[in-house]
């Protein structure tokens, strides 16, 4: 949910390469920005946030590409005067474009006995195809916060309108809605600002499910810096160790998927995925918001 951060602006970026050792990895990049609006015109502890996000994804050695651009808006309502209990609702609307270029793909007729030869004819005449559509998502979040404890639980629904994503004009294939439920907590441990994080995620789409849970610990090495380490487990699939560093408003994290299913035997045992994430929080000088009383909600 947008707006849940210390500061006034947040810039974020993420890069993920999946199954890189298999020869044709899935590559996903995202970039986002969100900010809080009208802090002096809404009730204390409430947060009104807007943002934008872009996503670029490619697979099949670049033969399939997708681009998503979206805008989001959310509002957090404090349920009591001290801002400990909060309820938020958010919406996201975006434009998505999918393209597949058959000239970048290999077909059975191009196999020469030892590998694929792109100079051999594929006998396919599809060429390049594209499909664009509008997409809508929504989510809810409840958060409880004190000085030393934060707990949240949320749910969201993606692809609410089930847009048609078929590349063929005379056929229709509706993108199934995806449902998620997530929960987590943060606890301050001891007097030096160390932190313990717990979290879990459940996703469902068209009969497929994914269940993750994990734990991380943040070691405060100074007033400006914290070092993080932890691990997630994607049930029945992979272990995801994680390390990270926060310095003032900048945070970077790195995780790697250690595959523990039969997929690890495809070509090489080094078939995991890695992910790099970055966040930058920017705070305006306080004299800009002369009556600003808000703070971090989550």
Named regions from a protein language model:
Residues 1-298:
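Subset of outer-membrane beta-barrel
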């Amino acid at each position: 949910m947008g707006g849940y951060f210390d500061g006034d602006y947040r810039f974020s970026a993420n890069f993920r390469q999946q199954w890189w050792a298999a020869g044709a990895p899935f590559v996903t990049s995202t970039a986002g920005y969100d900010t809080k609006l009208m802090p002096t015109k809404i009730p204390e502890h409430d947060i009104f946030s807007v943002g934008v996000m872009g996503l670029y994804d490619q697979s099949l050695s670049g033969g399939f590409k997708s681009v998503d651009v979206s805008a989001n808006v959310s509002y957090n309502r404090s349920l009591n005067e001290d801002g400990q209990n909060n309820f938020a609702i958010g919406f996201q609307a975006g434009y998505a474009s999918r393209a597949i270029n058959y000239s970048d793909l290999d077909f059975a007729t191009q196999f020469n006995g030892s590998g694929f030869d792109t100079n051999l004819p594929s006998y396919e005449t599809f060429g390049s195809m594209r499909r664009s559509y509008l997409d809508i998502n929504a989510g809810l979040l409840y958060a409880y916060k004190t000085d030393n404890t934060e707990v949240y639980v949320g749910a969201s629904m993606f692809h609410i309108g089930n847009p048609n994503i078929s590349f063929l004009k005379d056929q229709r294939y509706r993108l199934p809605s995806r449902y998620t439920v997530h929960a987590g907590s943060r606890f301050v441990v001891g007097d030096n600002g160390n932190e313990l994080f717990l979290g879990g995620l459940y996703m469902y789409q068209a009969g497929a499910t994914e269940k993750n849970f994990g734990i991380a610990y943040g070691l405060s090495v100074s007033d400006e810096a914290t070092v993080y380490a932890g691990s997630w487990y994607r049930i029945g699939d992979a272990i995801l160790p994680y390390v990270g560093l926060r310095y003032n408003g900048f945070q970077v994290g790195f995780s790697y998927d250690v595959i523990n299913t039969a997929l690890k035997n495809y070509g090489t045992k080094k078939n995991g995925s890695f992910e790099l994430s970055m966040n930058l929080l920017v705070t305006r000088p306080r004299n800009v918001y002369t009556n600003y009383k808000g703070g971090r909600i989550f």
